[in-house]
């Protein structure tokens, strides 16, 4: 069954895809992480939705700079809030 995402989530995913298609090929591979920041952003938005996924994406992009070594940094799994309160 196909997942449904909010309009805001879909718009942000489209913006990231436009970046991947129209800008990224011209500036080359610069991301210090695996998965790349743009792939991370799409996965975070699909997994966690607009607010949390957007926040995770913003934090990840801000970490992607020459002073950070980078490395493997996957999107955290979605947790059930009810389980955390027990």
From Swiss-Prot:
The keyword Hydrolase does not apply. The keyword Cell inner membrane applies. It comes from the Bacteria. It is found in: Cell inner membrane. Belongs to the UPF0161 family. Keywords: Cell inner membrane, Cell membrane, Membrane. PANTHER family: MEMBRANE PROTEIN INSERTION EFFICIENCY FACTOR-RELATED. This is Putative membrane protein insertion efficiency factor. It is a peripheral membrane protein. Could be involved in insertion of integral membrane proteins into the membrane. InterPro entries: Membr_insert_effic_factor_YidD. HAMAP family: UPF0161_YidD. One of its GO terms (cellular component) is plasma membrane.
